[in-house]
Structure formats: C-alpha cells, structure tokens
Amino acid sequence: MSFKKQTKTPTSWFPGLKKERDLSHHKERYCTQYDVIKVNAYGKRQQRTLAVSSLGVSNLNGQSCQWFVRNSDVYSIEQDPTDSHKFSLTFLHRYHFEAETPEQAKSIISEFKRLGVGSPSGGGGGGSGVSSNGSNSTATSPNTSPIRLYVSDPSNQPTSSSPPPQPPLSESVGVHRSSPMLSSSRMISQLSQSTSENNISSPTYHPQGLSGSSTSSSSASGGGGNNNNANNSTPPNLIASSASNSSLYSSSINSSGIINSSNNNSSISFNNNNNNNNSNLTTTTTTTSTFKTPTLPISQASKFNNESESMGLSPLTPNSNSQTALMQHINAMPNTPNSNSTEGSRVWKIRAEELKKQFLLKKSSKSTQTVATTTPTPITKADIKIVLDDNKDDKNKDNNIGSGGSGNSSSKINKEKDNPYINQPSSLPSNNNSNNNNITKSNSTTTSQTNDKKDVCSSTINFDNLEVSSSSDRDLSSSKSLNKKNKQSIKKLTIDDFELLKVLGVGSFGRVYLVRRKDTGKFYAMKVLNKKDMLKKKQIAHTNTEKMVLSTMDHPFIVRLHFAFQNEDFLFMCMDYVPGGELFHHLQKAGKFPEELAKFYIAEVICSLHYLHSNNIIYRDIKPENILLDEEGHIKLTDFGLSKSGITSVVGSKNGGEGGFATTFCGTPEYLAPEIITGAGHGKAADWWSVGILLFEMLTGRSPFLASNRNDMYKSMIQGNLRMPMFLSSDAQDLLEKLLVPDPNKRLGSTQGFEEISSHPFFELIPWRMLESKMITPPFKPTIKEISLPNSNSNSNNNSQQPTNNNLTLSCDPELNAKINFQRRKSSAASVYNLDSPFKNFSWNKEEEDGIMGERESIGSISSNNSISSSPTSSSPINNNNSGGSNTAGGHRILTRKSTIGKNLRKGSV
C-alpha cells in the first residue's frame, strides 16, 4: 500500500523544488532559465538548468553553478539532426543537452542566438546595434558588416584581396587572449543595450597611449577626419554617455582607428612571416577617411595578452602569436633526449652503466682473478714473472717468451712508477739476448721501447690481459684451475635430476615437495610454481623478488635457496628442508605459548627482520604459517613471495615518510597494518605491526582484532580498538600497546628500528648477539616424525622395483611422478611464453655462483665440497643418516614433519 500524498497539480517533467540559483555571473542582467537534461559521454542523464543572458551562459545544478562561459567564447550551438529533442553547446568541450520537446529545443537555440551565443559574427544583445558614424541610426544586422580575416602571403607581396593598412592597436585595448578576431558589433550592442535599459549614464573607458590627448574621431597619428559629435572639453579618458548619445561609443572607438562597426566592410589582417619580428598585426577599415599610421608588430602587441584585459577563452581560434611559439617549440625539438625526457634518459643511462659494469666484472673475474686477490706482501725479484699476450690459449705455454714473438700490434706494456711489486727493468740483471725476468710484448715493432729505460719507466701496466704468477700465488693458481674444472662439471639442472618423495604443502600459487637429488642424495624442499598461473594472477614480480631475496640473503633464521631452474611450464626452487614443521601447527596444538617461549620466538623473528630491513627489504607476510622450526627448535622464515626490495622509508608518503615505500595491498588480512589497508603507503613499520599481531596471538591464542566480518575487523584495526587480556605481564602489555599503534610514526621501531625494540624491558634478559649466533638452546625442541622410505637406485629412473609401505607409495602415486606432473606440454601457449619470457633470468645455481664469484678459499675446501657444495649449514639427522648418498638394503629413514593441511587453516595471503 502506498502512502504517497496525492496532489492535484501534475508532477512536472523536471522534478524538484525551485530554489534560488547562483546567477552572480550575470551581474543583475535579465536572464532566461531553461530546465534541461544533461547527457554525458557515457549516457548518464543529469538534471540541469541553463541560464542565458547578454553576458554569458551558466550551467546550474540546484543552487550551485557548475560552469559559466561568456557568449563570445561559445563556438556553436546546434540542434541534433537525428533527435530534435537534443542540442549541443560547444566551447572548451562539447556538451549535450536534451529538452522536453522539440519546440523547447528550438526556442532555446533561438534565444541563445538572439543573445549572441555561438554567433561567429558577434551579434548579441537582442540584435540591436549602434552606428559607427556618430549618428543615432541603428546599425543593420551583424551579417551586413562582417569582420573578415586576411592572412597575407609569406613573401610579403601585396595581393588584390589584401586591404590597406590601418592605425595600430592602442595599449589600452586588450587583444583577445586566444583569438585575434574582435567582435565590435557585439561589444557595442551590449553596451548600448545596458545603458538604454537602465537609462543611466555610464562612464566609457577610452584607449590611452594615442598621440593626441583628445578622444575625437580624427586620427590619433595626425591623420585627417571629421566628427561633429566629439566633445573636446571632456577629459580624454572618460566620456559621460546616456541612452540618447549612445552613438558616442562607436564614434570614440572609431576615433582610434581600431574598430569600425559601420555598414562598410571591415577586416582584420595578419602578416604571418617566418620571422616573428617581421610579423605585423593590422586592423583595416574601409571608410571615407584615410589613416596613415605605422603597423604594430606582434612582439609589441603581445603585452596586451594578459588576464585582466582578456575578453574570455576561445581555444578553437588560437592567435598567431601562440601558433608561432608552438611552431618554434616543435622545430626546436631534436631527436636526441631533451628537457621533456631528461629524467628518463638519466635513469636509462645509469641502468646501462650498471649493466656494463656487471658485464665487465664477470668478464674480468675469469682472467684477472689472481691479480685482484693478490696479497699485499712484497714480492721478490726472483718471484716476478709477468707474461702479456692477447691470445689467452697460448698464454701459459712458455715461461720466457722472446721479444721478437709475433702477436697483436695493438697490445702495449704500461708500467706504473709507484707499483712496489714490480721492479724497474734497470734494476734487474739484463741481457741483450734474454732476461731471467722478462717483461715482453707480442709486437716485434716495440722491442726498442723495452730497452729504453725512459719509455718503460714512464709507462703503466694494463691489467686487462695481465697474469702475475709468483711462488706465493701457486695455491691460488691451482685453486683457479680446480674452480674451472668444477665449473665445467656443473651442468644445468632439470626436474629429472631430483626424486619426488612427498608433498609437504599446498599454497595459493603452487606446491612444495620433499625431493632428493639423485647424484648427491641431499634432501631439499622444492617449490613448484605454474607459469601460466603466475601470468594470470600477475605474480611475476613477486616470484622474481622471492627468488632474488632467497638467493642473496644469508642469515641463520632465513631459509636458503640452493637451486632455481625452469622448464616450459613450471618454475622450480630448491630450498633448505626444515623438518620441524610450521609454527602455526605447534601453536594450534598448544593453544597458546608460555611467555618465555613466545619471547624466544619473537626475538628470533625480530633478528631476521632487522637483517632484512638493513638490506632495504620488507617482508609483509609475517604469520605463524610462514615460520618453520628446524630440528633444534630455531625458526626459519620462508615464503618471500610478498617481500619488497628497495624500501628505505619507515612509513609511507602520506604519513610524512621519505625515501622508497610501497603501496600494494597485499598480505594476510589478520596481520595487515592500517597503512596498508588505507593505501597511504607503507614501509618498514608495517612489519613491526605484524610482529605485534604475532606476539599477541602466541601469548593469547587469538587475534587481537576479532570481528564478525572482514570490514569490521579493518575498521577496528584502523581505529586501534585493542583489548588487552589481564593475565599478560605488564611488560608484555606495554610492548603490545606500543607495537599495535595505528599511526606508523608513533609505532615502536619507527624512529630507531631494531635498537628501539631490543631495548624494551620485555627483552631485558635476551642476549641478542648470542641469540643470532644460535648459541642459546631453544626452550622447545620439536618432535620429528620418522617415515621410512623405500630403497631406490639414485642413478636410475626406474621406480618399479622399489618396495612400498603404508605411508609412502612412490610407484603408484601420480603426484610424485615427475614425468606425469612436469612433462612438457605440447601446446602453443608454452612456446609463446618462451619467446620473451618474464622468467628468463629465473634459473640460478648456488654452486655456479660460488664458482664465478670465487668464494672458495683453499684447495681443500674445493675438493671437499666438489660434489656436495650446497649442503645445509646446520648439521641435521638427515645429512648424518645419508652421508655420501649411499643406499642400504634396509632403505633410508628420513625425518619429516606432519602435514599442516587441514580444515583449521586460515585463508592465505591476499
């Protein structure tokens, strides 16, 4: 049942009450209002009111004015030919309106044109005009005296259509800012109409700067002319006028020789030359009187183009001055980087230099490794032996090469004067035929320079193709050869080099398998990601960041990446296998942790975050699911898919932070910082908020911000509605209250970072250095469940002879068959990804990286780690039971954790 009040008066087509409109732009002029519908480009219909007067057009929305435009600035108003209800108004943009009826649309257009809206000739004020000859007769229609635009030939040659020159513009008359066209009849008719309606005398401003002080119709430059209506006794600037002598407006304007609104044809001409100094602006009028005054250049007329003297905007008719400036700007633009691309070219130049340095570093690490690592101990004369040859294959053939040997003519010997390790040739026992310690060249044309003491002493050593071998560097040279052999023995890894043993977990973007490398017998946790899923979910940057962080970070509380490789469809990352399980699994079993145990875990988490923050990396996904426990009870941070590098700011930009920050909305909802939720930008302080959430959950067994839905939880996080349990200690409550502060600037750790948090009374008895070195025994050691594995030949791929047991069946489980799961997909999509794959630099090998960078120090370490260079740092029962990768008849017994896949898991990261 409807309770709507029924009224006798029918509802109008334009609903809503009539309110006072903002008509201040019309300045108390009579204006006509029309209720219309405004239609935007997307088809949205809005109720508007158009108010038009002799001054301009207003678009009213209720009591407010959306925009106001002068009549002279409107380019056109026209009715839609397809739909007679609609019409459009064009000035800066094209606006579409819809009237109630076609008749109303026609009446609106006629009224607009009557008031001079959209009229190119400038007619306005109801079509009234004023004579320019001083008489009281009304001027004819504006179409009878049009203003024409003449553009002269660039050759400055007069044509038949070019009008004669006329007097220059006065300084007091403002040239239109965007258009050179001056609508004289419109301005005169508006002034005459306003004076006739109000029947009052209004002062008229006349141009100053003319050569004469009077405002008569005679030429200001000395030209002759007759005007009987001029009043020489009136001051030169103001003339009192009324409705009876409204023709004085036209006569005064005609006296300066600028605008003539008589029935004769007037014109405006522009001389557009290639040179701006030669371009002239002349206003011509075909009258009986003759004016002979010099023309005014655009360079002098440009000072009239200011906002105070502008008569409005007309972007569709730009003046010649703006066109000339635009053409100069376009012609001055070279093909090389300019001011518009200075920043971009600078960034790319820096990036190119960095890539060049990296390339040269890798290239020179092979040839000049022994030179770069030379010990600063002084070298004796007998130990010096420098061999220079551009041909690297024949570099070590002979110890003494004659000076007449053939070689590249561009190679030179340069020797530094200040080098303490290389003696001058004059101090060495020399001989004309041979030298015991030779410094030779491959080019025979430069042998005379080696005998010349002055030339050799003034030269320097070029280290590009230099090899220094001495008795103290024999171990380094031998280690270099072993490194080269070891690097040649390293091959690219594939999935066939590993044996899938168990599914450890399933995440949002992939799976984690327990694998064993066939040649070494080492166990790893292999994370497998689908390339197609990564591309669909736009996780390319996160995946590459995770690989970069894991391959570069070296901390006892962070998992290490050993291998990263790929095929056409999948990405593989082999990391440390941590058998203790997830912290979430142990917290779920215990309900809540004692304060000492929670203090130990949160202290190790803070140490790992401090290491990441010192490398300008934020983690952004701290939760018990991403914290693993090793066999001793220490933590390991894993899953760096949401980490972000290059973060130097503690807070975001809207919070007053400086430096690099992030704005991506990502993380687990229960652990999101308020600045991440609001999108204000976040930095390192967002991780300290997550630390507070984690500590609260370990101490109480629940989340600090509980709500019925996620939006209410976000609101309570932003507002900081924290309810602290009474059973917590005072130090724990104080730490949680300072960590869970919504404002990141006031949060604990935002000013001094790790030092501010570690000095809190809650961590008073924590020895941080010993903790980071794993010298403190953990309060809890996880129970490792043992699972027996069947006997398998690591050198063969045939699993049919392997026995099975109750817990693991390798031959029957299709999920553990690499050929079934990760075989090459014969599809067109796989080949498309390989054309320009975003994961082209994903493959990484720790052994190969160690060989390139030369991190091995001695021959013994190289020989001992030649086959197993990627073993975990901490000794684990897995490595002890499987040393050397040998197989026994009874089979292997490995340690693994219980699966944490269950119905009690919270939702993953967003």
From Swiss-Prot:
PROSITE patterns to which the protein is assigned, alphabetical: AGC_KINASE_CTER, PROTEIN_KINASE_ATP, PROTEIN_KINASE_DOM, PROTEIN_KINASE_ST
Keywords: ATP-binding, Kinase, Nucleotide-binding, Phosphoprotein, Serine/threonine-protein kinase, Transferase
Stretches with biased composition (Gly residues): 119-129
Top-level taxon in the UniProt lineage: Eukaryota
Ranges of residues in domain AGC-kinase C-terminal: 764-854
Biased composition (Low complexity): 130-160, 169-196, 209-220, 227-239, 270-290, 422-450, 788-809, 859-886
Domain Protein kinase intervals: 498-763
GO annotation, cellular component aspect: cytoplasm; nucleus
Modified residue annotations for Phosphothreonine: 664
Reaction catalysis annotation: L-seryl-[protein] + ATP = O-phospho-L-seryl-[protein] + ADP + H(+); L-threonyl-[protein] + ATP = O-phospho-L-threonyl-[protein] + ADP + H(+)
Active site, UniProt feature: 621 (proton acceptor)
Region (Disordered): 119-239, 270-295, 391-454, 786-812, 859-910
A molecular function (GO) term: protein serine kinase activity
Enzyme Commission code: 2.7.11.1
CDD domains in the record: STKc_AGC
Residues binding ATP: 504-512, 527
Family, as annotated: Belongs to the protein kinase superfamily. AGC Ser/Thr protein kinase family.
The protein, known as: Protein kinase 3
